[in-house]
Amino acid sequence: MTDAGRQGRVEALSISVTAPYCRFEKTGSPDLEGDETVLGLIEHGTGHTDVSLVDGAPRTAVHTTTRDDEAFTEVWHAQRPVESGMDNGIAWARTDAYLFGVVRTGESGRYADATAALYTNVFQLTRSLGYPLLARTWNYVSGINTTNADGLEVYRDFCVGRAQALDEGGIDPATMPAATGIGAHGGGITCVFLAARGGVRINIENPAVLTAHHYPTTYGPRPPVFARATWLGPPEGGRLFISATAGILGHRTVHHGDVTGQCEVALDNMARVIGAENLRRHGVQRGHVLADVDHLKVYVRRREDLDTVRRVCAARLSSTAAVALLHTDIAREDLLVEIEGMVA
C-alpha cells in the first residue's frame, strides 16, 4: 500500500475535476440575479427558510447569527448547471462534474431517525445521479447543546442518526469527507453537501488530533464522522476543503474559557493539517500555509468574543482573505470558536 493509502483515504475516478468555488456576497445583491454559474446559495442570517430551487439553484437560509448587519450569502459557483431538481426534500443542481445539494429536517424532540433518513437520502441521490465522491458537508443544527426528549444532547442525537445512515448503507466512516457540525438558532437541521462525479478525493487527518470516528464514548453513544480536510481535484491542481477546526488536542478541549487560546490552537491545527509535511504524508504534493486559506467562516459562541477572535484571525490570516464571523453555538459546550475555510 502507498503512503497515501496508509495515511489518508484516497479515491479516484477517471474524470478530471477542478472544484467549484465560493464567494461571500451581500444578501439580496442584484449581482446574483441571472448569474448562470451559480450552483447553490446559502443565506446566513437571523432566520431560516425551507430549501427551494430559485432560478435552478438550490437555496436556503440558516439562522447562524443574531444581527442583521452580519448577514451574508454564501454563493457556490461552477460551470452553468446542466440540471436541477428536488428529490426526497433535497434541492440539488449539477454540472457534468459536480452535484450540490441542500436538505432540511424540521425541529423535533428527537433527531436521530430524521438524520438517518436525511443522510440515507443524500447517499442514495449521489449514487443514483452518478456523483459517488462526497467531498464536503455542512450541518447546521438548532439547539445543538440543548437536550432532546430523552435527555441526550442534540448534537449527540444528530451523530447517532448520521452513524445509523452509514451503518445501513455499509459506508466506511473513513470515507466521510471534511464537514462542519455547528449550531443554529432555529430551523431544525440543515445539511449542505458537495459531491463529485470523478477526480481524486483524499481525506486528510491531523497528527495532533484524534481521528473523529475514533473518539471515546465520553463524547456520545456514536462518534462524529468526518475528515479534518478533504482534497478534491486532478493530480495537477485541486481544492482543499478544511473542516470546522477547534481548540482541541488529542480529543480534549484546551484553554477552557479562554477564547484567545482556543482561537490560536484552532489556527495552529489548521496550519498543521494543510502544511507540506502533513499533506505529503497523505499523498498530496503541494503544501500550504494559513495565508493561502480563503473564504473562512468563523463561528463564535459568545458575542463579546467577536472582536477578540477577529483580531487573532487578522494577525494570522491573509489580509485579502474573505472572513465571515458568525455568532452561534458550537458542538461542544466548552468550545468558544471554530474556524473553517478552503484553499484553491
Swiss-Prot record:
Effect listed in the UniProt record for changing residue 338 to Q: Loss of chorismatase activity
Catalysed reactions, semicolon-separated: chorismate + H2O = (3R,4R)-3,4-dihydroxy-3,4-dihydrobenzoate + pyruvate
Recorded consequence of changing residue 215 to F: Decrease of the affinity for chorismate
EC number: 3.3.2.13
Enzyme class, broadest EC rank: hydrolase
Keywords: Hydrolase
Effect upon mutating residue 228 to A: Same activity as the wild-type
InterPro entries: Chori_FkbO_Hyg5 (IPR031038), FkbO_Hyg5-like_N (IPR049368), RutC-like_sf (IPR035959)
Entry annotation: catalytic residues: 338 (proton acceptor)
Regulation: Competitively inhibited by 3-(2-carboxyethyl)benzoate.
Single annotated GO MF: ether hydrolase activity
Pfam families reported for this sequence: FkbO_Hyg5-like_N
Residues given in the record as substrate binding sites: 155, 162, 215, 228
Top-level taxon: Bacteria
Family: Belongs to the FkbO/Hyg5 family.
Main function: Involved in the biosynthesis of the macrocyclic amino acid-linked polyketides FK506 and FK520 which are potent immunosuppressants that prevent T-cell proliferation through initial binding to the immunophilin FKBP12. Catalyzes the hydrolysis of chorismate via a 1,4-conjugate elimination of water to yield (4R,5R)-4,5-dihydroxycyclohexa-1,5-dienecarboxylic acid (DCDC).
Subunit comment: Monomer.
Name of the featured protein: Chorismatase
Lineage: Bacteria, Bacillati, Actinomycetota, Actinomycetes, Kitasatosporales
